[in-house]
Amino acid sequence: MSKQPNILLITTDQQRYDTIAAMGYDYMYTPNLDRLVREGCSFPNAYSPNPVCMAARHNIITGLPARYHGFDDNYFDDNPKVIPYDLPTFPQLLSDAGYDTIAVGKMHFQPYRRHNGITKLELMDEIPRHRQDDEYALYLKEHGYGDIQSIHGVRHLLYMLPQRSMLPEELHGSSWVSHRSIHHIKENAGKRPFFLWSSFIAPHPPFDVPDQWADLYKGKELPPLKVSTTPLSALAEENKNIADYPTEAYLRRARELYFASISFVDYNIGKILQRLEDMGEYDNTLIIFTSDHGEMLGDYGTYQKFLPYDSSARVPLIVRYPEVFKGGEVDRRFVDLNDILPTVLDAAGVAYPNPAILPGESVLKKSGFKDRTKQYVEHAHGSRRWASIRNGQYKYTYYYGGGKEELFDMINDPDETTNLLAAQETCECLRQSFPSESVSAVREELHAALVEQEKRYGLEGYVKNDELVVLDEMQPFFYRENNPPMFPKEQDEDFVSLEEEVRRAIAKEEVVKLSELDVPYFTKSGTLSEKKLKK
């Protein structure tokens, strides 16, 4: 490449590591991501450094952990937390260097429309509070669908349950991201270099795929669920409440729709790649594909994210850059989302003001200062906080609430079914296979390594006298996604009722029966009428 490359960052939300056919998961249909694998470099040991939406996305744009940017978890509108204004973001650094910086889709910034150096920002939020702040919501109104409030699927009552999109395929959020991305590629091709962030909400729940894609995985063999043989953490036990599946058939169908959602995103990614080719910019573009975190999807009976297990914390990562990668390369070193900022700046030839503080390093380099033999992940604060570290064979997690610990053998037990520290006390066969002194030695080695990572990159106050602190045990609470539509009534007097949206969303999903759902729980807030729902 003789000129500064364009940069295309494609992100999905909540996509597990094991969802791309060409990376070894042949139950998936992902022809366009498979193409990127063939033409670039895939990273099968990629992790989210904090597996929850807002935290991970702030790591991406700053290249730094929550210790610096402040977002250790998801925060909401009533929390005044913001990135420090003197903290560089890579879109701002690219903009300062002459790039046109564009973002389309879900950002999950706070404040909502903070640009972070992005000069053209077109938002599609999961739960837009005001239509005028959300370009996608305005787009739907312009195209005759302004009466629908649950534009990304019905979250209230049906959050993790099987459902369909109430929109035609061409107006679905995933289609809109590709449509607007294609527009900006056409507008910018041949001019100054551009950075484009195409950010899909899918496959984040609700799994509201269009009708044409809904049966792609119906009846097909899917990977078995992971099952734990030892007790789970309090955080994982709390997590089990997020989904309410009356029967196994509901979960099976939800998994089918999750995978279909990914295939639909893949289809739209193909459109974006094709436009780059048509404009002659494909080989002059650094393309990065990844996700902010994974999805438990029923493994160990848990759902969503924010857990240290690979289903939640491990993500797909593919980089296409012909100047460095010949195609079909596989880099099995540990990488994470903190590496995106230095990778982007490396390709663009842009310096970071204070590189010594960055935990990440460009993946375009085959070697460097970063120790890629270990991977550190963190999440949250207080008694809900945990931190994890793994090497080539073992993963160790420390839960600050009560000082609980987990240790998994990732070679012999890649599904993380048996916590060696718990199993030693109960299983004679494990005591023979893993003598207590061996388990203890591994635990001590990784515990010491985690202390060093927490001292350097973790939130302040969690290491005292070179030891991880012990806090009061976490108090689990019963949690269900309780998100009725939020558009103020004055925005539109002709909204479809929530009850009608529920009926439309499940009309073609035979497995879902209203009589089997926990409707009373969702009527307590007064936003859903059981009588109207069942009329």
What are the language-model segments listed below?
Residues 28, 206-212, 274-326, 336:
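Histidine-centered active-site microenvironments of extracellular/periplasmic hydrolases
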Residues 1-5, 16, 42, 243-250, ...:
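Long, internal low-complexity/basic segments
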Residues 30-31, 60, 106, 111-115, ...:
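Polar, surface-exposed loop/tail segments
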Residues 1-41, 50, 95, 211, ...:
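Active-site-proximal N-terminal segment of extracellular/periplasmic enzymes that hydrolyze or transfer
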Residues 3, 26-29, 48-52, 78-87, ...:
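A short beta-strand-to-alpha-helix junction
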Residues 128-132, 293-299, 338-341, 346-415, ...:
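C-terminal cap/loop subdomain of S1 sulfatases and analogous C-terminal strand-loop tails that border
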